[in-house]
């Protein structure tokens, strides 16, 4: 049994809000869609983050504009909203692929709005 599963079974959802980080989860080898399905109603906060193969450094993946990577961010956001209990969306991006952080903020916000959030 994984530590995450032990935590999820042990934490009282009426006392603790779980924030699922869909990008870091992918980077760690898990699939956010599967986790949302396994624990419906448990993820009030969703860390919306997409990943691509890293261009260098020690990491295998780096963050990118949501919807442009390999995480299936839109499908995860939609499912988390539908069955995961998600009400708060926190967009995160630490790598910018030649853009400025503000350009990425604007693009990520535009995409979330296009998705209906």
How should these model regions be labeled?
Residues 1-20, 24-117:
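Histidine-acidic metal/acid-base catalytic patches
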């Amino acid at each position: 049994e994984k530590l995450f599963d032990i935590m999820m079974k042990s934490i009282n959802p009426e006392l603790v809000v779980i924030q699922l980080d869909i990008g870091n989860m992918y980077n760690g080898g898990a699939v956010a869609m599967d986790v949302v399905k396994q624990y419906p109603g448990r993820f009030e906060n969703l860390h919306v983050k997409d990943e691509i193969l890293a261009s260098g450094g020690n990491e295998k993946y780096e963050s990118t504009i949501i919807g442009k990577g390999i995480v299936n961010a839109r499908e995860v956001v939609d499912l988390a909203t539908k069955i995961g209990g998600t009400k708060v969306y926190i967009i995160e991006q630490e790598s910018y692929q030649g853009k400025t952080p503000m350009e990425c903020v604007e693009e990520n916000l535009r995409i979330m709005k296009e998705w209906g959030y």
